[in-house]
């Protein structure tokens, strides 16, 4: 499943394609959304927001399209008139004079009023977004030590969108490798230095991934600015200590870690 950085980059691409441009055609696959098609013609997208792994497309008439890609949903940007060759099922089409955005395969799609936006079950449940520039390590530390989360093992906590929105499996393993911890630790057991390092890594690594993953620095031997240290690298030597990276399962998800420097 795409994680927060990937969802945010998708939102950036959608905004760049159609933000501020009048919609010339709107189509929804689901019957309950059909009445909104005519309401959106002539309106425009004001901005595209992310809340963790959910994407909110805001329109100039104050309606908001909520979508959660889950495992299979994917957005595409195409030139208007282009019909991509795909076996995926089209769910949403928002067309402007020159660009069209298409949502395929997603099933969790709703149209929300401003009032519904404040009471939506998923949006109420998610914690602060790791890509929100206003979220600080101090606030993250407070959440780590709160009665709700301090007794939770990191293996499960770092996948829980109620703790911090936008984290997922690759971020979970990369963050824990960065701070040298295994997934069975709890916040209540950390010393001050470990807690501080974790609070910073929980923000820095997702933000670095969002900003640089896929970009290349020709002065770096390995190329990409953001690259995995342990994720999908089982059987390879750890770049920090040389031990062999291992793979196991924690909280029903693949977990990659270094037994030499994660304790």
Swiss-Prot record:
<dbReference type="InterPro" id="IPR012319">
    <property type="entry name" value="FPG_cat"/>
</dbReference>
<keyword id="KW-0456">Lyase</keyword>
<feature type="active site" description="Proton donor; for delta-elimination activity">
    <location>
        <position position="253"/>
    </location>
</feature>
<dbReference type="GO" id="GO:0008270">
    <property type="term" value="F:zinc ion binding"/>
</dbReference>
<keyword id="KW-0479">Metal-binding</keyword>
<keyword id="KW-0227">DNA damage</keyword>
<dbReference type="Pfam" id="PF01149">
    <property type="entry name" value="Fapy_DNA_glyco"/>
</dbReference>
<dbReference type="InterPro" id="IPR044091">
    <property type="entry name" value="EcNei-like_N"/>
</dbReference>
<feature type="binding site">
    <location>
        <position position="169"/>
    </location>
    <ligand>
        <name>DNA</name>
    </ligand>
</feature>
<keyword id="KW-0238">DNA-binding</keyword>
<feature type="active site" description="Schiff-base intermediate with DNA">
    <location>
        <position position="2"/>
    </location>
</feature>
<protein>
    <recommendedName>
        <fullName>Endonuclease 8</fullName>
        <ecNumber>3.2.2.-</ecNumber>
        <ecNumber>4.2.99.18</ecNumber>
    </recommendedName>
</protein>
<feature type="active site" description="Proton donor; for beta-elimination activity">
    <location>
        <position position="53"/>
    </location>
</feature>
<dbReference type="GO" id="GO:0003684">
    <property type="term" value="F:damaged DNA binding"/>
</dbReference>
<dbReference type="GO" id="GO:0140078">
    <property type="term" value="F:class I DNA-(apurinic or apyrimidinic site) endonuclease activity"/>
</dbReference>
<feature type="binding site">
    <location>
        <position position="125"/>
    </location>
    <ligand>
        <name>DNA</name>
    </ligand>
</feature>
<comment type="similarity">
    <text>Belongs to the FPG family.</text>
</comment>
<dbReference type="Pfam" id="PF06831">
    <property type="entry name" value="H2TH"/>
</dbReference>
<dbReference type="InterPro" id="IPR010979">
    <property type="entry name" value="Ribosomal_uS13-like_H2TH"/>
</dbReference>
<dbReference type="InterPro" id="IPR015886">
    <property type="entry name" value="DNA_glyclase/AP_lyase_DNA-bd"/>
</dbReference>
<dbReference type="GO" id="GO:0000703">
    <property type="term" value="F:oxidized pyrimidine nucleobase lesion DNA N-glycosylase activity"/>
</dbReference>
<keyword id="KW-0234">DNA repair</keyword>
<dbReference type="InterPro" id="IPR035937">
    <property type="entry name" value="MutM-like_N-ter"/>
</dbReference>
<dbReference type="InterPro" id="IPR015887">
    <property type="entry name" value="DNA_glyclase_Znf_dom_DNA_BS"/>
</dbReference>
<dbReference type="GO" id="GO:0003906">
    <property type="term" value="F:DNA-(apurinic or apyrimidinic site) endonuclease activity"/>
</dbReference>
<keyword id="KW-0511">Multifunctional enzyme</keyword>
<keyword id="KW-0378">Hydrolase</keyword>
<dbReference type="Pfam" id="PF06827">
    <property type="entry name" value="zf-FPG_IleRS"/>
</dbReference>
<keyword id="KW-0863">Zinc-finger</keyword>
<dbReference type="InterPro" id="IPR023713">
    <property type="entry name" value="Endonuclease-VIII"/>
</dbReference>
<keyword id="KW-0326">Glycosidase</keyword>
<dbReference type="InterPro" id="IPR010663">
    <property type="entry name" value="Znf_FPG/IleRS"/>
</dbReference>
<feature type="zinc finger region" description="FPG-type">
    <location>
        <begin position="229"/>
        <end position="263"/>
    </location>
</feature>
<keyword id="KW-0862">Zinc</keyword>
<feature type="binding site">
    <location>
        <position position="70"/>
    </location>
    <ligand>
        <name>DNA</name>
    </ligand>
</feature>
<comment type="function">
    <text>Involved in base excision repair of DNA damaged by oxidation or by mutagenic agents. Acts as a DNA glycosylase that recognizes and removes damaged bases. Has a preference for oxidized pyrimidines, such as thymine glycol, 5,6-dihydrouracil and 5,6-dihydrothymine. Acts on DNA bubble and 3'-fork structures, suggesting a role in replication-associated DNA repair. Has AP (apurinic/apyrimidinic) lyase activity and introduces nicks in the DNA strand. Cleaves the DNA backbone by beta-delta elimination to generate a single-strand break at the site of the removed base with both 3'- and 5'-phosphates.</text>
</comment>
<dbReference type="InterPro" id="IPR000214">
    <property type="entry name" value="Znf_DNA_glyclase/AP_lyase"/>
</dbReference>
<feature type="active site" description="Proton donor">
    <location>
        <position position="3"/>
    </location>
</feature>
<dbReference type="GO" id="GO:0006284">
    <property type="term" value="P:base-excision repair"/>
</dbReference>
């Amino acid at each position: 499943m795409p994680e927060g950085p990937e969802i945010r980059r998708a939102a950036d691409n959608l905004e760049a394609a159609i933000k501020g441009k009048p919609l010339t055609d709107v189509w929804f696959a689901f019957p309950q959304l059909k009445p909104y098609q005519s309401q959106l013609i002539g309106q425009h997208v004001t901005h595209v927001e992310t809340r963790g792994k959910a994407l909110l497309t805001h329109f100039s008439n104050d309606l908001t399209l909520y979508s959660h890609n889950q495992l299979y949903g994917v957005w595409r940007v195409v030139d208007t008139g282009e019909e991509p060759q795909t076996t995926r099922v089209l769910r949403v089409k928002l067309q402007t004079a020159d660009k069209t955005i298409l949502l395929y395969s997603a099933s969790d799609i709703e149209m929300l009023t401003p009032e519904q936006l404040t009471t939506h079950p998923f949006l109420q449940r998610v914690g602060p977004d790791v890509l929100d520039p206003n979220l600080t390590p101090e606030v993250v530390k407070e959440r780590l030590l709160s009665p709700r989360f301090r007794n939770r093992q990191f293996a499960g906590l770092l996948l829980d969108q109620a703790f911090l929105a936008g984290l997922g499996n690759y971020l979970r393993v990369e963050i824990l490798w960065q701070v040298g911890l295994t997934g069975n630790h709890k916040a209540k057991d950390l010393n001050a230095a470990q807690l501080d390092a974790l609070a910073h890594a929980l923000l820095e690594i997702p933000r670095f991934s969002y900003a640089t993953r896929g970009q290349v620095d020709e002065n770096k031997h390995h190329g990409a600015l953001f690259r995995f240290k342990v994720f999908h690298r089982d059987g390879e030597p750890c770049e920090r200590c040389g031990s062999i990276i291992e793979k196991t399962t924690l909280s029903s998800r693949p977990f990659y870690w270094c037994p030499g420097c994660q304790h």
